[in-house]
Amino acid sequence: MNNKYKDIFSTFLNLFWHLISGPIMLLLIPFYLTPEQQGYWYLFGSIAALSTFADLGFSNIVLQFSAHEYAFLEINNEGYLLGTESNLKKISSFFKFVIIWLRNICSVAFPVIVCVGVIFLARDKVLSIYLLPWLIYALGSLINFFNNTILSFLEGMNQISKIQKTKFIVAFFNTLIIAAGLLLQINIYSLSFGMLLSSSFMFFTIFKTYGKIVKQMWKESKTFSYPWKKEILPLFKKYILSFVSGYFLFQIYTPLMHLFHGAEYSGKVGITMSLVTAAFQLANIFIYTITPQINMLIEKKDWKMLDNLFRNRLLLSLCSYIFLWGCFAIFVYFFADFAFIPQILSRFLSYKGISILVFCYFIQLFVNSWAVYLRGHKQEPYWLTGIFAAVWVFLLTLLAGKMLSPDLFFIGLLSQYIWGLPVSYIIYRNDKKKWHK
């Protein structure tokens, strides 16, 4: 199979398994956990998700920079990096920088995360019951955080197919562990052991597959240093602002709907957004899988090949999104009144609400793709518009929640895309013209 299709297929397989495994867990949890255990099950995941704020987009920077440094290198049949000495030393020094950064972040962030969990458990007077599973889960989350950053480094070296295949195997392994644990009635420990064992398996798989490269880079880094902090920190500051803006732009809707219209409608928002973002992620595979190539072509200044690749993949992404929602519309048209389908559809927002959200994410495919293209130049040009958009959407969503029906809850997001699309394109066009002189 051609490498580009391997990347797409492996990424699709991994994402598709996540779409399947979620409902499997949703079916098993109510049968094998008490309501209290179910609550702490999701609490563990929510607290561990604070690690997202320890990353703040750093893993994206890792992928970009490793791709730039790998542009003039290759991996030989024996599993070693080949290239000029200067290129080898530079990518090796960057790898060492990433490891040191991870060590410092993990030593601060994860003790804080563990303490947050302990505070919740102590407040609820269940510390003696849930402390051990929480510590096991937190340790697994720490290993997983480390893994994800290293995987970003390797994906930058154009290893997406192998990495996504490994992620799929680990995700499948994790689902089996959790399902087996629930069936064996070890309750919340099944989640904890699933996280620890799957993340440990990923850790050992990484170093088994890429151990020679890791040893080679670590050895090379001892005799060469490069001021990566000076180059990365200015960009990272803008990434932080973009990350925080994006968090408010896409994560505020369920709690705000809950605030204004109650649990029933917040549930509808949650499940509708899950469906729409799943379609977006499937369509975005065509852009995600060429991210390393975009960075490498920019490093080589091969603008013609870059633009041809980007244009073709963006078209595939847009067509895929339209095709997915076309299939959904046909299915609803013919089966909306069939058997249990009405009961399922009643859990979602109205067709008007879904349509607004679907259109917004269609525009997001453009904006996200332009951002990937421009960020490949080691720049973050959308940080300022991101902040303005986040404030705009937050305020208008507050007004919509208070004054309009739930069907129009996403009107603030829609209005942002109406003015945001041309602004984003102008930034893309102007920066591309400036940087490709």
List each model region and its residues.
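Residue-level signature of transmembrane alpha-helical cores of multipass secondary-active transporters
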Residues: D7-L15, A48-A49, L102, C106, ...
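Interhelical loop/hinge segments that connect adjacent transmembrane helices in multipass membrane
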Residues: M1-K4, I188-M195, F204-F250, K301-K304, ...
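Membrane-interface junctions at transmembrane-helix termini in multi-pass inner-membrane proteins
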Residues: S141-K165, F359-G386
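Hydrophobic alpha-helical transmembrane segments
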Residues: L135, Q164-V214, F388-A389, P406-N430
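Signature of the first transmembrane helix
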Residues: N3-H68, F72, K237-A263, S274-T277, ...
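Short membrane-interface helical motifs at transmembrane helix boundaries
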Residues: V108-S128, F323-L345
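Interfacial transmembrane-helix starts/ends
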Residues: Y5, Y42, E78-N104, I232-F236, ...
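Helix-loop junctions and terminal segments of transmembrane helices
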Residues: L56-E85, F280-K301, G376
